């Protein structure tokens, strides 16, 4: 192995420089404030949903089991990236250790893949609830929900494991500058001085499987849902069904479309400058919006949150 190459098999680079917006110093403070507020809102909102789903008996249905897992994923998702981003924006040393970078993209890909499958499971739940209401309790039983969630976590881990094993073996040469806010596999692969065709191909295949297949299931489920909703004679019933589903579709769009742009375009056309801003959609914007999207139009969740706040108030009083 050449002495100027660094890899998992030899000397690994000590650290990566995360460029972020350091080339635009005027943007760092406003972005720092936005990210900090978004992170606080994401933490508060998702913790509230998890607590309400756990302690309120009215929210022990499959829909809220999936929602509480989605909120937990979003908590972990934002905590994996945002604190590091905030530290770098407030410091002149915008670095992350090689080990820290590896852990970050490993966990990030694990959680991202898991969330793709959880969102598909939520679409399946809504399909059964609206299109097969008489069989809902039999089909969407608690054991099945737990199995789907376990499948999501295990699949996400498998995807992440493959990506990490392939990426840590790449040699890196020269100055290790990542034109991104945090470590992601496409950006790290871009720094390698070796031929990354195998990495690019496997990344595209895995992302296509774990992103496009769940997305196809979601769109198929909502196609059947739309057809069933249009048959509902009650305008109130149609409005309630569309309200629940539209919030889910908005989250799906904000999460999947940027991910597809980032991970499924040819490496030759991949723009790190555009990609680092697009990655903010699924790393912070979607996790921040999720609690509000799922509660503002959901009477059961709003009622549960009010009861939770009342209980906390009594305990504090």
From Swiss-Prot:
Keywords: Cell membrane, Disulfide bond, G-protein coupled receptor, Glycoprotein, Membrane, Olfaction, Receptor, Sensory transduction, Transducer, Transmembrane, Transmembrane helix. Residues 1-29, 84-104, 163-199, 264-276 are extracellular. Disulfide bonds join 101-193. It is found in: Cell membrane. InterPro entries: GPCR_Rhodpsn, GPCR_Rhodpsn_7TM, Olfact_rcpt. It is a multi-pass membrane protein. GO terms for biological process: detection of chemical stimulus involved in sensory perception of smell. It comes from the Eukaryota. The chain crosses the membrane at residues 30-53, 62-83, 105-124, 144-162, 200-223, 241-263, 277-296. One of its GO terms (cellular component) is plasma membrane. GO terms for molecular function: G protein-coupled receptor activity; olfactory receptor activity. The keyword rRNA-binding does not apply. The keyword Nucleotide-binding does not apply. Glycans are attached at residues 5, 199. SUPFAM superfamilies: Family A G protein-coupled receptor-like (SSF81321). Residues 54-61, 125-143, 224-240, 297-317 are cytoplasmic. Its main location: membrane. Belongs to the G-protein coupled receptor 1 family. Odorant receptor. This is Olfactory receptor 2B11.
């Amino acid at each position: 192995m050449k002495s100027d190459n660094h890899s998992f098999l030899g000397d690994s680079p000590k650290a990566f420089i995360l460029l972020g917006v350091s080339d635009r110093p005027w943007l760092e403070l406003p972005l720092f404030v936005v990210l900090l507020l978004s992170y606080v809102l994401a933490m508060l909102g998702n913790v509230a949903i998890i607590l309400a789903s756990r302690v309120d008996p009215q929210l022990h249905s499959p829909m809220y089991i999936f929602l509480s897992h989605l909120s937990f994923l979003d908590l972990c998702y934002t905590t994996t990236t945002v604190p590091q981003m905030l530290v770098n924006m407030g410091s002149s040393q915008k670095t992350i250790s090689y080990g820290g970078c590896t852990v970050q993209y490993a966990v990030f890909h694990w959680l991202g893949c898991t969330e793709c499958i959880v969102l598909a499971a939520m679409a399946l739940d809504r399909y059964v609830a609206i299109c097969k209401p008489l069989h809902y309790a039999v089909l969407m039983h608690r054991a099945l929900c737990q199995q789907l969630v376990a499948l999501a976590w295990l699949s996400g881990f498998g995807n992440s494991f493959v990506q990490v094993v392939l990426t840590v073996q790449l040699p890196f040469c020269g100055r290790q500058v990542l034109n991104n806010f945090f470590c992601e596999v496409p950006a790290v692969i871009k720094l390698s001085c070796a031929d990354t065709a195998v990495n690019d191909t496997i990344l595209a295949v895995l992302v296509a499987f774990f992103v496009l297949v769940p997305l196809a299931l979601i769109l198929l489920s909502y196609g059947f849902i739309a057809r069933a909703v249009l048959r509902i004679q009650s305008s109130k019933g149609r409005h309630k069904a569309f309200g629940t589903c539209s919030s889910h579709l908005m989250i799906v769009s904000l999460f999947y479309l940027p991910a597809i742009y980032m991970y499924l375009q040819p490496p030759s056309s991949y723009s790190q400058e555009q990609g680092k801003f697009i990655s903010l959609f699924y790393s912070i914007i979607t996790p921040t919006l999720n609690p509000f999207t799922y509660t503002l139009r959901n009477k059961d969740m709003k009622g549960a949150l009010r009861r939770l706040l009342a209980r906390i108030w009594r305990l504090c009083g």
